[in-house]
A protein has these predicted regions:
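Membrane-spanning beta-strands of outer-membrane beta-barrel proteins
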Residues: 1-3, 9, 55-59, 106, ...
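Residues on the lipid-exposed face of transmembrane beta-strands in outer-membrane beta-barrel proteins
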Residues: 4-8, 62-66, 79, 111-115, ...
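Short polar/acidic secondary-structure junctions
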Residues: 11-13, 69-70, 159-160
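Flexible, surface-exposed loop regions and adjacent strand-edge segments
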Residues: 39-48, 92-100, 129-130, 139-144, ...
Length: 200
């Protein structure tokens, strides 16, 4: 097993709109024996446990956090990206030797933008997952399309009698994207959620 990692972090403060910037990146390389994964079998709600033998995993995780302030308005932006190559190296004679393991994308990422003003919070999030395969062989029959989705939420926070009241309205899958996290299990189209919480 081999591991490599690096991290960079910055904490930049300024009197103008730009307040803070954090950057980080981590690289890794692992060889894992008897890696167990779960993936959906032929029947609905039934998952199969699979021992992959030996898996070679290389990857990079990177993130960026930025904070801005414009008078009473505060803004935060967070970006994340992952590249991961996880391949089965158990037996060179296997047809799936050095194929990407099931349901692990090579590319994935997210972006979140938030604006806060006098107890109000507006948040937008975008999630992307790249192409994957539903079984050990990386063939067109097992190909799973990339997917992405956007969510939007509005939150109001009130302090009443030393208690914190939070009301949130969410729009999930804002643009009605058709996508499947798991093959043949379509996710909901645009949907809504309202919630209220009280912190005593």
């Amino acid at each position: 097993q081999a591991n490599a990692g690096f991290t960079y972090s910055g904490n930049y403060l300024h009197a103008g709109p730009f307040r803070k910037l954090n950057l980080s990146a981590d690289g890794y390389w692992n060889k894992v024996k008897d890696k167990i994964i779960a993936y959906p079998g032929g029947q609905q709600f039934r998952w199969t446990m699979l021992n992959l033998g030996t898996v070679d995993i290389k990857g990079v995780d990177a993130s960026c956090d930025a904070f801005f302030s414009f008078g009473p308005v505060e803004t935060a932006v967070k970006l994340q990206y992952t590249w991961q190559k996880a391949v089965d190296v158990t037996d060179p004679d296997d047809t799936f030797y050095k194929n990407q393991i099931p349901y692990v994308p090579k590319h994935s990422g997210s972006a979140v933008a938030s604006i806060y003003y006098k107890g109000w919070g507006l948040n937008y999030s975008f999630i992307y997952t790249g192409e994957r395969y539903s079984n050990k062989e990386n063939t067109w029959r097992n190909y799973v399309l990339p997917w992405y989705t956007s969510d939007l939420s509005l939150q109001k926070t009130l302090n009443i009698n030393k208690k914190t009241l939070k009301a949130t309205a969410e729009i999930n899958n804002l643009f009605g994207q058709d996508y499947e996290v798991v093959l043949n299990y379509p996710m909901p189209k645009t949907n809504f959620r309202l919630s209220v919480s009280i912190e005593l």
